[in-house]
Amino acid sequence: FTSTLYWYNEPYIFLTPDGSYYDYSGIIHEFGHFLNSYAVPSDLIFGAADYEICEMQSIGMEFMATHWYEELFGPDTARMLLLDSFFNSIINVMDGAMFDEFLQRVYAEEDLTKERVCEIYAELYKEYGNDVYDGYDKEWISVPHNFDSPFYYISYCMATIPVLGLYSELQTS
């Protein structure tokens, strides 16, 4: 993740590499946040700039980097990773919409209980076509954005769609 070191007013990337492809995609994604934070500084009181713009830069960086996948990983792996990028984009759009709808419904409830929150999530989880597993109704708890940045998740959805349009444009020009 990328954060701001407010004492220095500088962005900083925190990454725990594990030797996989995700080291590359992680640093590329976070570098998009870094550039955004560097160009449009955030502050301790008001936080980050527009989330959709931050995510557009990060997801955009990921897709721009696919141009070098073959050189970095070889042709077979490059194709697989490109397909993985597109698959993750579909997931970003679906999850972004689902989590936004989830939070809208949660915040609209009058007498909310933790059981009701889990029920709402379970309903939406199934409605969005996800595979049910033991404990899926509590999956929302493991998403930090639900607590520290409510309604952030729609940013992934809103950023992915124009980025895919730009990526398509890059491929034809």
Predicted regions and their residues:
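Cation-handling catalytic/transport regions enriched in His/Asp/Glu
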Residues: 1-173
